[in-house]
Structures are given as C-alpha cells and as structure tokens.
C-alpha cells in the first residue's frame, strides 16, 4: 500500500494498521508458521506489537536500497569511522564524557547544564538522543510531549562479539552464519581485513532478551557462550569471547532503535520531530524516508535546516 516513500505514517493508512500477528492470522497462516516468522524479528519485540505498516516500510526501503545500478559499500574498519570522520571536520572537537542533565530556554537563548555543573549557552539546541535517554534530561516539555517519550518502544538487542582464529565451519560445509530458533538468535561472521581471523557476532532480538537482561554481565556472557559451544563444539578451541553489548541496559540508548506499535506513528512520529521553542529534535526515530544510520543523517539535515530558519 505504500506508493510513496514517506506514506508509512500517513494517518489514513495508520487508521487501518494492525499488528503483524493479527495480519498473519487473518491471512490464514498456521500458528507454527507464525512462530517461525516471529523468530529473530528485527522490527518489533514480538509480533503482537509489530506494526504491519512498519514492515511495509522496511520492504519499501530494501527495494530502494537494492538493484543492479546500486553498489554495496562499506566503511573501512567499521561504520563508526563515518561519524568519527564527520566529527573531525568540525571547527571544535566533540566534548566526550559530559552527560547533559538539563536543557532550559528563554525567548532568546538556551542553557544546557552538564553533570559536571558546567553550563553552556546557545541560540538553539539539537537533541539527537534516543527517547529512553532523552527522558532522563530535564527539558520542561509540555506534559503530553514528555509522556510521549516513554510511550514508544525500543528494540531489545543483545550482542556478543567474538574473534575467530580459523574458519571452523568450513570442515562441516557450513557457510559461517546461522539463523536459529534457539537462545542464540542469529550468528554473523565476517573476515577481518588484512588477517586470517573473523569477527563473529551473536545477535539476539526482542523479548528473547528479557531473561538474559536480568543476569549480571558475567552470567549473561557465560550463558550465551555455553549455548554457542553446544551448537558448534568446533568453535570453542578457535573462538575468544570479546564484548557483550546489551542495548536495553545502556542508559544512553535504552534499546537499539525505535519501534512503532500498530497505528502509533500517525500522531507520535510528527509530534516527536516537532521543535519545542529553541530545542530541535533529530535521530533515526524522527526520520521519514530512511531508518538506521541513513535515517539519522536524514534527520540531522532536517533539524539543521530548522535551526537555520529560526536564526535567519
């Protein structure tokens, strides 16, 4: 039903939106198939809360980003190098380790208070934080706007990053990546450029993260590692466990990306991207055309133009 890129949150379409669970059942899918479809769902923590229109949006985006005329490109040594390079072009360095506790404004300026007690004055502020982190900052938002920050779900993701010294999967005729219906979710392996080693990432999605998120870091890492060795015993001798990342437990994130419940985006999306006086909002949750890093950059351009219009 999405004939235009930005139509996914159109109120008329949102009025007929439903959960992926309801949609699949209406189409006659058996429960066993629905359970399988819901495994490793990246677009909702469970199918009952997954917007069917959001899935159409994802399909449309994949269509725009693929095709014979489009080349697949990667950032050398990881995606983080891209924002680092952008930061390197700024006139002033990015200040790290300075959490913001409050943003207040008058008719002529904004005042940003840091955890250290330092206060910054500016003509305008662009807030790009994920909504769970934004909730922790005192901004004197209208009550309805402040309440909305806590009403949008964020995707639960746990990642265990490992280093593999040798491609153990080749002897078994495997391809090196796995899609499972077990605790492990999905497993991705990628060669490390210039070496014979591989990065391996265990990627667990949605409500399957709940039982792991209540464990301490050591117990969580051990639980995932044991499941990994049980699935692929040959991996144990050549695989070292590196970093555990639990997005929902990170106070500066609260989850991997924003999720829209059925029908929610019709009103919530435009409300969250609207400026509040001299405070402007960006981040992937405010983007219209794209998701992820592309959406974050799209939203940054939009917010910058909004500030320029204010200050013109």
What role is predicted for each listed range?
Residues 98-107, 114-174, 235:
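Central helical "cap/lid" subdomain
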Residues 9, 13, 71-79, 118, ...:
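Aromatic-acidic/polar surface patches that form glycan- and anion
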Residues 21, 25, 83-87, 101, ...:
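Non-transmembrane alpha-helical segments in soluble domains
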Residues 54-63, 119, 157-159, 199:
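Intrinsic-disorder/low-complexity, polar/charged segments enriched in Ser/Thr/Lys/Arg/Asp/Glu/Gln
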Residues 109, 156, 172-312:
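Conserved flavin/dinucleotide-binding core of flavoenzymes
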Residues 30-38, 167-173, 237:
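A short alpha-helix-loop-beta-strand transition element characteristic
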Residues 2-99, 106-107, 128, 138, ...:
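Active-site/ligand-binding neighborhood in enzyme catalytic cores
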């Amino acid at each position: 039903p999405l004939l235009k890129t930005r139509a996914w949150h159109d109120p008329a379409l949102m009025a007929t939106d439903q959960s992926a669970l309801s949609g699949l059942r209406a189409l006659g899918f058996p429960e066993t198939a629905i359970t399988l479809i819901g495994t490793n769902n990246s677009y909702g923590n469970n199918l009952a809360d997954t917007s069917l229109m959001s899935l159409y949006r994802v399909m449309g985006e994949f269509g725009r980003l693929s095709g014979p005329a489009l080349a697949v490109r990667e950032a050398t040594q990881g995606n983080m190098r891209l924002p680092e390079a952008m930061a390197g072009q700024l006139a002033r360095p990015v200040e790290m380790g300075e959490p913001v506790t409050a943003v207040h404004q008058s008719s002529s300026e904004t005042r940003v208070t840091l955890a250290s007690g330092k206060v910054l004055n500016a003509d305008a502020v662009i807030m790009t934080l994920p909504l769970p982190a934004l909730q922790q900052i005192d901004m004197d938002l209208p009550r309805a706007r402040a309440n909305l920050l806590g009403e949008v779900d964020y995707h639960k993701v746990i990642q265990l990053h490992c280093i593999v010294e040798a491609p153990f999967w080749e002897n078994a005729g495997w391809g090196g990546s796995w899609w499972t219906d077990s605790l492990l979710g999905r497993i991705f392996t990628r060669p490390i450029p210039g070496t014979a080693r591989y990065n391996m990432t265990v990627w667990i999605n949605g409500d399957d993260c709940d039982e792991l998120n209540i464990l301490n870091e050591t117990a969580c890492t051990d639980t995932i590692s044991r499941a990994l060795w049980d699935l692929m015993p040959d991996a144990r001798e050549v695989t070292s466990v590196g970093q555990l990342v639990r997005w929902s437990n990170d106070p500066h994130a609260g989850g991997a990306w924003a999720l829209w419940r059925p029908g929610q985006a019709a009103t919530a999306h435009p409300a969250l991207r609207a400026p509040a006086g001299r405070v402007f909002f960006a981040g992937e949750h405010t983007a219209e055309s794209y998701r992820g890093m592309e959406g974050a950059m799209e939203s940054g351009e939009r917010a910058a133009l909004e500030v320029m219009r204010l200050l013109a």
